[in-house]
Each structure stands twice: as structure tokens, then as C-alpha cells.
């Protein structure tokens, strides 16, 4: 769970606490975050909790401790996120990310149609290239069909027997969870 404990005068979250699993059978504070802004643009996040959460946890990892952990271009697009190891983000004419470069040299390159629909994503990690193509409602990975998208969810085509997954939506139509046919999340 999350609890906002303070906002700034612009309505931005200034302090946030997250609670989650801290051990095999224990729960507690996993994040005690303080946000710093320049106007409405976040520039820094600090976490007063130094212990990492339980395996598989979702706590914030403070990957940098500088005054400008996040930087932006003239259009307000994020160009650097040191906490996630992102050293540079380039944008196309539609202000959509075209190339994301990480501090370890990995890259993600995006290709879009003229109206901004994503056609391809290319990940280069440790010299290994993975190409994902988005063709209508089918997602291909390195030329092999991996997912068939539907309004209700998707079909995982990466195994010998296709597996169906369904979206659970809230009252506003937002996806809140994805479950399989056995209702496992």
C-alpha cells in the first residue's frame, strides 16, 4: 500500500511511504520517499529506507544521489533518469521516445508510424538484439508470433499450448490485473 504524507504548493507529491513484504511472513515500510522538484519537474528522489525489500518486492532503488537525477529537454520530455540507469533519451518529431540509452551501453530503439503508432522495438542488451514487431493485434519477437491481443486480454503464443490471459478492469476501464484461465494473477 502507499500513503502520501505531504504535497507541495503545486500539488506534487513531496513525501510518500510504501508498505510491502519485508520477509517471508512480515510486512512493513519498504520506501520512505522524498521528492524534489524544479517547478513541476521532478529532479531528485531520496529514500530514507536503506534495506532492500523481500525478494520480488517493488521498492524504489535509489540508483543515484545527485541533485539532478532527472533532466528534461525544452519540450519537457525526460532525457535522463539516473535512478533507472538511463543516461539519455532521444525523441522524434512527435515527442515520442526514439532511442533510450542506458549507462551499461544497452539501448532500446522505437519505430513509429507517421501518426505515432508503435511499429517496432529493438532491444540491444549485452550484444544480444531482440526485435519486437507490432502488426495489428499480433506481436512478433524476432519474427516469431508471441502474443495475440484481444479486447478482453491476450493469448500467449510462446509455448506449445497457447495460454489465455484476461484483463480485470476497474469501473473506469483501466486494467487492474491480468489473470489466466485459473484466475491466477
Predicted features along the sequence, with ranges:
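Residue-level markers of secondary-structure register and packing in elongated scaffolds
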Residues: 1-15, 69-131, 155-185
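Conserved catalytic cores of ATP-dependent inositol ring kinases
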Residues: 1-59, 115-117, 122-124, 130-138
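A short, polar/charged loop/turn motif at coil->beta-strand junctions and beta-hairpin connectors
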Residues: 36-39, 64-66, 128, 148-149
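Surface-exposed acidic, glycine/proline-enriched linker/cap segments
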Residues: 49-66, 150-159
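Extended, non-globular alpha-helical segments
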Residues: 134, 143, 148-149
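Short polybasic amphipathic segments
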Residues: 137-141, 153-156
Amino acid at each position: 500500500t502507499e500513503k502520501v504524507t505531504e504535497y507541495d504548493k503545486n500539488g506534487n507529491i513531496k513525501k510518500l511511504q510504501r508498505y510491502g513484504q519485508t520477509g517471508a511472513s512480515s510486512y512493513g515500510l519498504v520506501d520512505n520517499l522524498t521528492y524534489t522538484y524544479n517547478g513541476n519537474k521532478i529532479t531528485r528522489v531520496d529514500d530514507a529506507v536503506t534495506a532492500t525489500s523481500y525478494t520480488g518486492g517493488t521498492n524504489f532503488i535509489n540508483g543515484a544521489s545527485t541533485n539532478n537525477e532527472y533532466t528534461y529537454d525544452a519540450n519537457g520530455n525526460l532525457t535522463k533518469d539516473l535512478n533507472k540507469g538511463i543516461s539519455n533519451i532521444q525523441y522524434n518529431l512527435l515527442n515520442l521516445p526514439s532511442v533510450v540509452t542506458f549507462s551499461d551501453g544497452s539501448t532500446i530503439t522505437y519505430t513509429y508510424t507517421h501518426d505515432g503508432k508503435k511499429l517496432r522495438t529493438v532491444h540491444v542488451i549485452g550484444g544480444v538484439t531482440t526485435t519486437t514487431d507490432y502488426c495489428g493485434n499480433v506481436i512478433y519477437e524476432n519474427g516469431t508470433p508471441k502474443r495475440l491481443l484481444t479486447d478482453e486480454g491476450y493469448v500467449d503464443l510462446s509455448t506449445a499450448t497457447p495460454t489465455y490471459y484476461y484483463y480485470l478492469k476497474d469501473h473506469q476501464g483501466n486494467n487492474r490485473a491480468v489473470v489466466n484461465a485459473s484466475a491466477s494473477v
